[in-house]
Amino acid sequence: MVDVLVLGTGITGRLVVQYLNSHRQKASFTFGLAGRSQSKLSGLISEFSLNNVPVFTVDVTNAAEVESVIQHAQVIINTVGPYWLWGNNVISACVRHGKHYVDLTGEPHWVKDIIATFDYVATQTGSIIVPCCGNISIPADVLVFVANKTLKAFAGSSATIDRSVSAWSLIGLGLSGGTAASMLAGFEEVPRHKLVASSPDFCLSPVQGVPNLRPRLVYTLPFSSPPVRGSCSAMTLNRQVVFRTWGLHELTSQLNARDSETAETSKALTYGPNFKYEEFMVFPSFFQALMHTVLINIGTITLSICSWARKLARRLLPKAGDGPSDEYLEKGAVQITNVTTSTDPQSRPTVIRTTFDGRGEPAYLLSSIMVAESALCIILNGRELPPVAKSGGVLTPMSAFGDVLVERLKACGRIEIRSEILLDADRKNADNTKKTR
């Protein structure tokens, strides 16, 4: 029996194994490898000198094989996508046997399906199922969670959020054959009605919120000087994950309202009934942001309705097994600034600025760290997890791991998270600040 089982031998699986093998707490946990290709498994064993690490050969399309293998671990890190095609057998086995699960999916249609299929059963077996534990969507979820804590520490536990906006800068973003296959599978394999049903902002939330802010051609970060502008984000799942976290916290607070022992703790995690969230990709100029928004929308529509466009994309995008080099992975970065404003109709709102800075290529190197630390939250900090996690279910990174994951990410050596109150919300040049976290 191992604590963590890494499923998959592609570029992300390799990076997760590399990270776990050199982890600062390596002596406190055990891990194993699982994959379909014996030669790739042997290659990883040889590359990282993992002679004492258990290895399992498994085909994720074979439910019986998956069922047998997952019983040898406490937490499964699943790096095998597209998850719409290959993920259900793994989650089904985990839920049935009370095992825990994290992955790196960016497929909202699949997340919506697994919530409907597995959430209730997971609460009965105590299985913690947390999809979306990579650069999609941990930074977005973390930023709002931390901003909410900063707000309540400054303005009191009854303070609520009106609007939260994140401005993303992704430097040196890589692309592998597996990610390309997952993207194209969303257009070719998923029924159209599933894609439509998984597009609303609150489609993953157990609670319906107020209407979110309307999409725009060009976005501007509030209280930024000079103005930080950008285009629509292609990572729509980020908003949906943030709203599921909001909904799970709202629902938990409502259920615990009459319990004096848990009511205050639950309320502290809520963002407020009028919470709205949006994000965008930063561009140097208004024109570049506008053109990116137009091209993203044209490209998405073309890929969704034109088979010739998907065939062309398949020829141009990386093939299975292809991916960025180790040298390339070290050159990337993610820099995100979030501005959150409180709901305060009688006076000036409180404004919080929170930043998330990651050193390394975001989609693979940083994602492998995020998903590995998510798994270790369960193994090494299980008693410290939020009450929602202890009940099991299909959760989000912040509803399942909360402060535990925030602190683990800050300790990994590549990620910095800071949050501060802007003292003068009326001035766009917000240099006068007070640090609170």
Where are these regions (language model features)?
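N-terminal Rossmann NAD(P)H-binding glycine-rich loop of SDR-like oxidoreductase domains
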Residues: 3-23
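C-terminal catalytic/substrate-binding lobe primarily of soluble NAD(P)-dependent oxidoreductases
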Residues: 13, 126, 149-437
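N-terminal Rossmann-fold cofactor-binding loop
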Residues: 34-38, 59-60
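Rossmann-fold NAD(P)-binding glycine/threonine-rich loop
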Residues: 105-127
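Short, conserved SAM-binding/catalytic segment
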Residues: 44-51
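Conserved beta-strand positions in the Rossmann-like core of class I SAM-dependent methyltransferases
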Residues: 29-32
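ADP-ribose/adenylate-binding Rossmann-like module
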Residues: 82, 93-111
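Conserved Rossmann-fold cofactor-binding substructure of NAD(P)-dependent oxidoreductases
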Residues: 57-73, 79-85
